[in-house]
Amino acid sequence: MDIQKQIEIIRRGTVDLISEEELKSKLQKKKTLKIKAGFDPTAPDLHLGHFVQLKKLKHFQDLGHEVSFLLGDFTAMIGDPTGKSETRKRLSREEVLENSKTYQNQVFKVLDPVKTKIVYNSNWCSKMNFEDVLVLSSKYNVARMLERDDFSKRYKAGQPISMIEFLYPLVQGYDSVAMECDVELGGTDQKFNLLVGRDLQREYGKEAQCVLTLPLLVGLDGSKKMSKSLGNYVGITETPIDMFGKLMSISDDLMWNYFELLTDLPLPEIENRKNGMAKKELHPKEIKTELAKLIMDQFSSPSENEEAIQEWKKIHNPKSRAVPDDVKEIKLGEEFFAETPEPLLVWVLSKLSFIPSVSEGRRLIKAGGLYLSEDKITDEKFPIQKGKEYLVRQGKKGKFLKIIS
């Protein structure tokens, strides 16, 4: 694949690429780049917030590059101070190792196990002696550390910052030195730490890595970043029915962000759906169902997911059980589409004698008496599109008609 096409794929959903020219140069010099993303195993499960980075690693993997999933089993015991207003509680070695095992099992739901290197930073960090730590510490200064927003705020507020927290970015940065990475990616909250790795590579006489930052996925609540501790997360090992239920709960505005970061749907197609919803040509629930399915299919089989979706709909639409088994079904002929490719539903229903007239159909809609499945029809100009099925109901317990267009 040519370099510009690779850059387009790599850039999708990213915030920073430092720098694009350097990345192009690396791609020109060697076919296979060393890519890494580090994950501190501070919680037992991976969720869709982690998946944003895993998906980008998969993009690199599909482009033929060498991908390393770095488990920060050593740095997890220090605790990342990023975004914290106070010193974090340290995890025990046992807790970290247990979480690491879980991460390692779950990551292969996304990455190709044959093409993925699982690396632990304790392999080099635990071998460093005090002299090595002093040499590493000499490569950076306190003034630079205080450029970090969270450190700066705590320092100005007179809140304590432990020396071990200053060491965290250095230890994380040293991972890039030890692994000789060409590209490191992480969330936007990790930008400072990623740039420290780039600086340290130069200090140790190595070629500086490119830095790629990705947005922090907003959680189900629509306001805070996805986090297990906040309860606004979707775990990548959740059952299909639970995953579908959670994804259907997100706001209509949030789903466009999920489409871009969590699926491979081309950006122009995402924009088409957005425009279709704005024009009321597409129903938000229909689009959200498609989004959920696209995400779920990356973790479970499509048939299993479809079964789960139908089961969820039955549970959450108890009225749908009242649909008669012998509901009348009509396949629309070409004559219905002779004058327009998308005839109005009320016109079709009047032609099929389901309602007395178009005007009666409009009156029913205004009165809230015409439904598609369990959803009230609110648009008098609701169009019928080819290749779809519509279950129409008149009144809460009225007659049904299934239209196949």
UniProtKB/Swiss-Prot annotation:
Any single Gene Ontology cellular-component annotation: cytosol
GO MF terms held by the record: ATP binding; RNA binding; tyrosine-tRNA ligase activity
Span of domain S4 RNA-binding: 342-404
Residues that bind ATP: K228
Key word Protein biosynthesis present: yes
One Pfam short name: tRNA-synt_1b
Reactions it catalyzes: tRNA(Tyr) + L-tyrosine + ATP = L-tyrosyl-tRNA(Tyr) + AMP + diphosphate + H(+)
Single GO BP term: tRNA aminoacylation
Enzyme Commission number(s) of this protein: 6.1.1.1
Gene3D superfamilies registered for this protein in UniProt: HUPs, RNA-binding S4 domain, Tyrosyl-Transfer RNA Synthetase
Compartments, as annotated in UniProt: Cytoplasm
Role this protein plays: Catalyzes the attachment of tyrosine to tRNA(Tyr) in a two-step reaction: tyrosine is first activated by ATP to form Tyr-AMP and then transferred to the acceptor end of tRNA(Tyr).
Record-stated family: Belongs to the class-I aminoacyl-tRNA synthetase family. TyrS type 2 subfamily.
Protein name: Tyrosine--tRNA ligase
